[in-house]
Amino acid sequence: MDYLKILLEDSSLAADFDALFDFFLLDEPTERDEVEGRCTFSLDGKAFARDGAGGEYHQLEDGSIGYVSSEGQCGRIAESIDDLIHLLVYSICWHDYCDSSQYTDMGTLEAYANERHDEIASYTEMDIWEEVVKALGMPSEANVAVELQKFYDAAHREPLYQGFYHEEDGSITPY
């Protein structure tokens, strides 16, 4: 499904989506923020969305999705736009699911996912969440652990999506 098209065509839905998931869709793909030419990346891509803290979502040359946080963390987070939207919608605050020690097996991941989801849902406007899910034509129930496993697999797939900061002294710092 073309979720981005749906969001671009419905500004009210896009505003609700941004409020719930901290995901502001750009009007069109743009060059990535390269900090005045001092940052380079391991894969080509374009920025297509931002979050409220200054992070960027990048569609990479192979169609997968990368993310660069304002703190300098960089990596692939989804294999496709559809996988990204599922990650955002079903894990709500995907940044809160990054404890790699919880991804050892599906049982551990399911317990972690359920615990985090219940906590996040307790302070999320779930009535608006339901409206957004319905407007996007997505099921209201999903196995969060399955979505998180796809996230983990994308993040660890080679080649890794990395950023590099070019220091004034000529050295390069990966992030």
Labelled PLM ranges:
Residues 1-72, 103, 120-175:
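A surface-exposed partner-binding patch
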Residues 71-107:
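Compact, glycine/acidic-enriched structural inserts
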Residues 89-92, 108-113, 125-137:
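Short, surface-exposed, charge-dense and proline/glycine-enriched linear segments
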Residues 99, 103-121:
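Hydrophobic alpha-helical interaction segments
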